[in-house]
Amino acid sequence: MQKDQQKLIELIKGKKVAFIGAGVSHKTLIKEFVELGAHVTLCDQKKSVEDFGDYAATIKELGIDLSLGENYLDGFKGQDIIMRTPGFVGYFEKPLPDAMAAGTMVTSEVELFFDFCPCEIVAVTGSDGKTTTTTLISKFYEAAGRKVHLGGNIGAALLPMLPEVAPEDVAVVELSSFQLISMHSSPNIAVVTNVTPNHLDHHKDMQEYIDAKRNILLYQKQPCRAVLGYENEISRSMQSDCKGKQVWFTRLHDTDNGAFLRKEDNMLCMAEDGVVTPFLAQKDVKLRGLHNIENLLAAAAAVWGEVPVEAIQKVGSTFTGVEHRIEPVRTLDGVLYYNDSIGTSPTRTIAGLRSFNQKVILIAGGYDKHIPYEPLAPEVVAHVKNLVLMGATGPRIEKAVREDPNFNEAELPIQHADNMQHAVELARACAKPGDIIILSPASASFDLYPNFEVRGREFKKIVNELK
């Protein structure tokens, strides 16, 4: 048994531990914590044990205490450790600060992994591009022969992997603002892709969202590396937070310190210590969209010097993308269908629209995260020929588009759909051979779906069943 794992066992054994919610990762951890000798209380808004469905039998079998219903957070009292879930908002509001003031340790699955992980950690955050950048980094290491543990906001829970993690391995972690908000550890290599308004339905304000992202940098220890997006004003401003080596990635500018797209020959290059190394031609990149060139530059800057250039070249010239990210679905009657359900914010949808060299038929709208849609409007006017809207944000998107000075209703018809099936039918009805229909909602999914993955898969199912 590794000493890091032994330290974790010593932390948990005999302690009173409260878990907020029984999500997928917590279900795994609850069982492990009970087996390690912890006395576990599950705090959840559900009203009875039967409301947990199939998991109710496990609760009874493990002897877990329950604190349920409206006052479920009363279960925090008298606990040694509180395991926070990323979905639990209000970190700085009562009763968590009260519990911390009373000496209770408030932590999370990802935080404990960072505290006890024996190997190098590379982590990525940002409003857009996190998953693609994280995936590219993991594939770069795999191509170089390193054993990779992929997790965080992508893949599986990391803490249960701890017994399998060796010092020579590498952990590649995607981190959301909800995971970062309470963290007091930072990775060896940190990447901030960009920071734009997002999740303002959960964060107190934009500053709290930015401060959460900054935590990926604030606790780095030498030797360390920070990769920041130069084009984004907020990520660029985080240079002052960096504790060690800092490099940029930029598509629009040259730099002598980081990864960039060289304009004269469209080569992706890395500049470091006075040496510029071209490593991949833009024409050889299989990923669609200029935003994915930025993701590739960010990933390359993160691993530069850690893996052979050949590993970056191999992955960069063969990787075609992640599900739900401008994902080709099918061609029917000459019409191309794309699933970009990851488009949960205006900036993501803008990147998707700019990936095509023709106007598209756009399906958009969904759950309202209280983010502004004015920046989306001119992009819709410039890149969309028919707009199909649904969900709570549909009227807000329509209002922003109609108020754009270049909007012309004759050139951009707007329709509203009751659901995804209806939206696909409306989009198909106005499509001609050669047209592109893309689902890129510029909104979260929670009004109709548990997450963007379920939304994207329903879209693909509907499209694939069209006759």
Q: What does each model-found stretch correspond to?
A:
Residues 1-108, 112:
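N-terminal leader/targeting and accessory segments in enzymes
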Residues 3, 8-16, 26-36, 147, ...:
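Nucleotide phosphate-binding/pyrophosphate-handling subdomain across enzymes
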Residues 33, 82, 124, 153, ...:
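Residue-level signal for inorganic ion chemistry
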Residues 39-47, 227-230, 363-364, 383-392:
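Short internal beta-strands
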Residues 40-44, 150, 172, 248, ...:
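Short beta-strand "acidic-cap" motif of Rossmann-like dinucleotide-binding folds
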Residues 41-44, 69-70, 107-111, 243-262, ...:
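Beta-strand->loop->alpha-helix junctions that form or flank phosphate-binding loops
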Residues 56-57, 376-434:
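C-terminal helical cap/extension that packs against the catalytic core
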Residues 74-77, 86-230, 234-244, 429, ...:
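Phosphate-binding loop of NTP-binding sites
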